[in-house]
Amino acid sequence: MSGEVDYGFGDLMDDPEDYCPPTPPPTSQVFTMQSGKPITLHLVGASPTEAHHLWNGAKMIADFFEEDLSRVKGKTVLELGAAAGLPSLVAAILGAHKVVVTDYPDPDIIRIMQKNVDECDETVEPRGRIVDTVDAMGFVWGADSVPLLARLNPTDDSHKERFDILILADLLFRHSEHGNMVKTIKETLKISRESVAYVFFTSYRPWKKELDMGFFDIAREQGFEVEQIAERRLDKPLFENDPGDLDVQKTVKGFAVRWSAEACN
């Protein structure tokens, strides 16, 4: 506006260079199982590891378990990069023997995961079953796996026991971490044709879907067999305003990663 008066404040009202905006508050969502049971899930308000999202891959794995209880009932389960931990909670509800739910060792993320475990326990009979079944802990992909294995049998110092089931939900966009993810699978998945790592994901950046799929090349190189076992096209993508092929962004794919017969001999 012409004729404005400069009162000499200059840039006084601008944010200082070292200003850090406040972290968004935690959020919550309700996931309803096919049985009709609601599960309240708390999420951190923001996270550089993307733990503030309830990913479509996690929802689809939860449904996948409920469609056939034998996939988790009585089994030991490890989830990597779990965020809210939805598949782990569903596995515990459906009768898994032991569940270890992990994400990056950020105190806020682990606190939220534990809160979800505690609140889920309050809705399941008998009380105490979920908290006794599910351990929430921090873990960096590719790190020493002994602390994970120790949760299966704390009194066994050999840590030879491994997990029947691994869960990786919407992690493959972390291309630089594929090798570390496979390393952890290799060190924690029971060497048996019956054990399986479930890898469900969407290529949220469609132009990088080949890089997402590169995870399975690394898995094959490390002695695993890979089989696509599920695919679902959703009504809308998780991120509605993102660029790229909309059909790819709405599609969730599920793969089973298993030890080869040769590796099991």
From Swiss-Prot:
Subcellular location: Cytoplasm
Keywords: Cytoplasm, Methyltransferase, S-adenosyl-L-methionine, Transferase
GO BP annotation list: methylation
Enzyme Commission designation: 2.1.1.-
Positions annotated to bind S-adenosyl-L-methionine: W55, G81, A82, A83, D103, W141, A169
UniProt-listed InterPro entries: EFM7, Methyltransf_16, SAM-dependent_MTases_sf
GO MF terms held by the record: N-terminal protein N-methyltransferase activity; protein-lysine N-methyltransferase activity
Main location class: cytoplasm
GO cellular component: cytoplasm
Function statement: S-adenosyl-L-methionine-dependent protein methyltransferase that trimethylates the N-terminal glycine 'Gly-2' of elongation factor 1-alpha, before also catalyzing the mono- and dimethylation of 'Lys-3'.
Family (UniProt): Belongs to the class I-like SAM-binding methyltransferase superfamily. EFM7 family.
Protein known as: Protein N-terminal and lysine N-methyltransferase EFM7
Organism from which the protein derives: Gibberella zeae (strain ATCC MYA-4620 / CBS 123657 / FGSC 9075 / NRRL 31084 / PH-1) (Wheat head blight fungus)
